[in-house]
């Protein structure tokens, strides 16, 4: 059975970020947290990279079944650089690091 994954992330818009998404079709009944594959995208179209080196990485953080569509999941993601560092627009990662530092 095919399953639709809708990857969702915040772009690099200034002064306000916007939601972006792209769809991937995978084999399987359903996807749980930790099962959604890492996926790449062209960051130049989302204000997250220059045209000459525009590869960015979507790292899934949380997966939810889509309540509006059968055989579909919503995949909430962070944006990372290809060198496995958080992208500068990745404010969630900055928050996680701050919370760890405070504890």
Where are the language model's segments positioned?
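ATP/Mg2+-dependent ligation/transfer catalytic cores
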Residues: 1-103
């Amino acid at each position: 059975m095919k399953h639709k994954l809708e990857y969702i992330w915040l772009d690099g818009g200034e002064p306000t970020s916007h939601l972006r998404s792209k769809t991937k079709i995978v084999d399987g009944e359903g996807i749980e947290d930790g099962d959604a594959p890492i996926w790449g995208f062209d960051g130049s179209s989302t204000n997250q990279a220059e045209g000459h080196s525009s590869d960015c990485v979507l790292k899934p953080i949380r997966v939810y079944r889509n309540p509006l569509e059968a055989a579909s999941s919503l995949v909430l993601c962070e944006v990372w650089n290809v060198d496995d560092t958080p992208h500068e627009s990745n404010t969630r990662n900055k928050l996680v690091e701050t919370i760890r530092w405070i504890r």
